[in-house]
UniProtKB/Swiss-Prot annotation:
CDD domains reported in the protein's UniProt record: SfsA-like_bacterial
One GO MF term: DNA binding
UniProt superkingdom: Bacteria
UniProt cross-references to InterPro entries, sorted A to Z: SfsA, SfsA_C, SfsA_N
Protein name per UniProt: Sugar fermentation stimulation protein homolog
Taxonomic source organism: Shewanella sp. (strain MR-7)
Family of the protein in this entry: Belongs to the SfsA family.
HAMAP family linked: SfsA
Amino acid sequence: MHFSPALKPGKLLKRYKRFLADVQLEDGTEITLHCPNTGSMRNCLFPGETVWFSTSNNPKRKYAHTWELMTTPTGGLIGIHSGNANALVEEALNKGIITELTGYDSLSREVKYGDENSRIDILLEAAQKPACYIEVKSCTLLEDGQGYFPDAVSLRGQKHLRELMHMASLGHRAVLLFVVQHTDIHSVAPAAHIDPEYANLLKKAILSGVEVLAYRCEISPDEIHLAQSCPVRV
């Protein structure tokens, strides 16, 4: 995924009201960005460090600028836009990068499924093969060298694990795919210290036949894309 038009830099001042962040430009001007991340963004906020943002030409938008990347104090990059995860996975599937998920003829997004009124992020289908239901989660929390998900208690995430277990019980292929949008994360683990119920459900899901994958992103101010798989430590 290429950033076009090119991203612009600024210095993070603060994030507030969940969806807003103030930054300072090189000329000293302060502007407000839309923050496209509903999570806690735990360990992803570094006031004074460089952020990268995109700009929309849509005159109807209240906030024209969108926060895309955060630079860490060690020079790493974090993909702030959690909504990009699905598009990154679709792009990687079309290029055959996710080798565990090749051999399908069609890809659909946001299809209703399960018994808790959910929509699957990605549905892969092919003749004479079980349908493949993929839930995509963006992982950005780094603590003591380990990547974790979720970064806050996630009832929605718990529901999605139950839905995947249900689909696996029906004979479908059910996959949880972590998209690692943090260049310093090299493995993913359930955050039992944050959401113990999610961690327990993940173990049950694996025993129920749900596949769990994780892929790291290569990130720069020019582009972001899925690059290679990394371990999931349960």
